[in-house]
Amino acid sequence: MKHYLALVFALFAFCFAWGSNPYINCVYEYCPAPGQFVNTMPVATEEDTPATMAAKADSAIANHKQEMISLGGYGGYVVFGFDHKILNIEGAYDFKILGNSFYANANPSQTTRRGGSSEPGIVMVSCDDNHNGLPDDTWYELAGSEYYKPATRHNYTMTYYRTPFDHQATPNNEYPFLCDTTYIAWSSSTGEKGYMPKNTFHKQDYFPLWMGDSISFTGTIMANNGVDESSTGSYYVSYCFDWGYVDDQPNELPNEPEMHASEFKIDWAVDADGHPVHLDGIQFVKVYTAINQYNGWLGECSTEILDAFDLHPGATSLEENSMDGEGRKKIFRNGTLLILRGANTYDILGHIINKHN
């Protein structure tokens, strides 16, 4: 039987009374690609393991802690979840993920494309279909503004290789901030090869200390968005994409609420072949860095994450067969009638939620 969703926009007090936490409840996996902030955000040691690093990432961003984590270069990811299903509300934005993107004041192309520091991350979502509370079900990508564009490549694999102990650094004499231009080698499934340089601003090991000698990531990769506007390597602008990515637009645009900055719709979900799918809700989110680009003294494009939360934590699902004797749709929670469709519906302050015509 086809399912429908009804929405109760109750007060935040309602949400907490029910024990629902709108913020990240748990980080299940933290697997960054190499990068200049890796092993420092959060701090890692050689004694760490995937489990201890997931716990450190959890301590940083779960439960509204808002301590930044870095995903490193292309493919680096984090998997987190919520203590409830985030419902797919038709026509609404369902959840928000915060990064540290900002617009540049001296942006030469501000009139045609906004930019500054944009390090976009792709979002994937999953339901708890097997009801085991773990993110081990099918993943769906949220198809942002670049998903169907020719420059975007899907099923792309990139592998990074740990730098050998006997490696000899290759500095760049023209750009002294680049102390090693052949630091971490990488290769791709399309035959590309290159290096992630090391800079003088971040001198720790860029390769995740708790990983093996190589790491591979597979996913969607987007076109580079960084431009050396100075042509001398002194001023880079990374331009924003239109919508659908983490750490791409600023977290808040108070003068432009229509932009829905850093907000996401579950309705954007597509399957592995790019076909739209309908999900009535999701419980798990995966974010990974979407671009492989090195922007001079700014370093690699690396998605950062600060926080994430449900935009309508008081929403409750409704099935079509929940009817009263007069054919009106009803929903209960803990034995209390919350919404009655087919009649006017009000919240606890008397404000109308749904008007029956």
Predicted regions and their residues:
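Bacterial Sec-dependent N-terminal signal peptides
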Residues: 1-20, 316-319, 350, 354-357
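A domain-level signal for the mature, folded cores of soluble proteins
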Residues: 18-121, 143-315
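Beta-strand signatures of extracellular beta-sandwich domains
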Residues: 122-124, 344
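Short loop/turn segments immediately following beta-strands, especially the blade-tip
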Residues: 126-132
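Tryptophan-centered short beta-strand motifs
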Residues: 133-142
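Short hydrophobic alpha-helix segments
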Residues: 142-143, 356
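Residue-level detector of functionally pivotal "anchor" positions at catalytic/ligand-binding pockets or at interdomain
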Residues: 312-342, 352-353
